[in-house]
Amino acid sequence: MKLFISADIEGCAGTTLNYETHKEEPAYQKYAKQMTDEVVAVCDAALAAGVDEIVVKDGHGDATNIDVMAMPEHVTLIRGKSGHPINMMYGLDETFDAVFYIGYHAPAGDPGSPLSHTSTGASNFIELNGKRMSEFMLNTYTAAMYGVPVLFLSGDERICELSKELVPQITTVSSKKGVGGSAWNVSPKTVI
């Protein structure tokens, strides 16, 4: 089995405020480590369950947040920006059997996450056919374009709820509950 994982930082456990996601900030390192730890935990579990090959796409900012040195064997990490239009899903094609998302968050303009946005912080919100578009929705449609099912999502409680509207059978793990500019975070150890 071949698995594609797209990872972001805003939905990872503990991450609450925008500055925590920026490399130039002193607090950033611990949240990048949490992102790495969550990716490694999912990769380890998938490999133990019999997955043969995993490709992880670092999808946050400049896409160099995940520590490549921490990746298990049989995992390929795509770092950096390719300039490809499928962005957070770069590397996905029809040869994959499943897609997982790690660290995802509510869409732009949604009060369910203090870090809600869609692709960029520059928009109030993006709509598709009258529905607020999240990165989850955008990337799930990308996966569908290649015929690859989306099976797992971790992130804030709101994106976990919204994901079930599009993919009812998806398995989700909530890392936090956002309320306006705050988040009720579960222990990062619980998420891993």
Question: Which functions belong to the PLM regions below?
Answer:
Residues 6, 39, 44, 48, ...:
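Structured catalytic-domain cores with a bias toward divalent-metal coordination
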Residues 1-4:
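Extreme N-terminal starter segment of soluble prokaryotic enzymes
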Residues 6-12, 59-60, 102-108, 157-159:
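Short glycine-enriched loops at secondary-structure junctions
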Residues 19-44:
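Short catalytic helix/loop segments, enriched in acidic residues and glycine
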Residues 79-122:
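N-terminal glycine-rich phosphate/adenylate-binding segment common to multiple enzyme folds
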Residues 142-192:
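Active-site rim beta-loop-alpha module in soluble metabolic enzymes
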Residues 39-94:
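Glycine-rich nucleotide/cofactor/substrate-binding loop typically near the N-terminus or early
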Residues 84, 120-146, 155:
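Active-site glycine-rich loop that binds ribose-phosphate moieties when present
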